[in-house]
């Protein structure tokens, strides 16, 4: 049967379907990773998204763009926590708030960080995204500190490590601490470092 639809309409329809399928695939990957599936298979994604396996394979040809869309979705989800202003004007109070905020952020994002760690070696986007995340963490920490502490390289490096996503991940995943225990452990390290420089 010959279609009497204009070619542009048929093309636009295919483009809309492709976009919708892509959104379903990204949402499916996010849900699978959130559920603890570190490296979802094409079959798992197809089942979760409700699309055909061939459709998934077509999108899997460009994994970096899928990772980018997943990262953008996560950033939008976490932005209200990141952007919230500090209630405290005192630098120590800001650090306490930063720890509480990062504990919530890291806990919500940890399944995605675990998955990203597995794939980073073969993804230019994930490597760049990791570098961006670490740069943002350091900049946020520097903005909360007194100038003399920010410029103390040993102190800053140690505090940056204590408050990093990697430390949270190690305490939660490798040492198997509960979220409250992980937060208390980091708080102990943070206060010990502050005490070590006489503040």
Which residues does each predicted region cover?
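Helical hydrophobic small-molecule/effector-binding pocket
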Residues: 72, 76, 92-119, 128
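Amphipathic alpha-helical packing segments from all-alpha helical-bundle domains
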Residues: 104, 108, 114, 122-157, ...
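Short hydrophobic/aromatic patch on the recognition helix
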Residues: 50-60
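Amphipathic alpha-helical linker/stalk segments
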Residues: 31-40, 47, 68-98
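Basic, helix-initiating cap at the start of DNA-binding domains
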Residues: 1-39, 43-48, 65
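Amphipathic C-terminal alpha-helical segment
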Residues: 156-179, 192-199
């Amino acid at each position: 049967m010959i279609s009497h639809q204009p070619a542009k309409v048929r093309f636009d329809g295919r483009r809309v379907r492709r976009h919708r399928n892509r959104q379903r695939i990204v949402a499916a990957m996010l849900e699978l990773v959130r559920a603890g599936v570190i490296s979802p298979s094409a079959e798992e994604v197809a089942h979760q998204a409700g699309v055909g396996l061939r459709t998934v394979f077509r999108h899997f040809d460009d994994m970096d763009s899928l990772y980018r869309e997943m990262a953008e979705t996560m950033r939008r989800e976490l932005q209200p926590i990141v952007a919230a202003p500090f209630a405290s004007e005192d630098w120590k109070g800001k650090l306490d708030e930063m720890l509480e905020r990062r504990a919530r952020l890291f806990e919500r994002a940890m399944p995605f960080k675990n998955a990203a760690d597995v794939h980073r070696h073969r993804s230019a986007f994930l490597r760049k995204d990791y570098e961006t995340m670490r740069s943002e963490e350091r900049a946020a920490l520097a903005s909360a500190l007194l100038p003399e502490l920010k410029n103390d390289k040993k102190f800053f490096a140690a505090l940056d490590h204590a408050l990093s996503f990697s430390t949270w991940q190690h305490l939660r995943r490798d040492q198997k601490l509960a979220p409250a225990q992980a937060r208390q452990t980091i708080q102990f390290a943070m206060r010990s470092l502050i005490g070590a420089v006489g503040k």
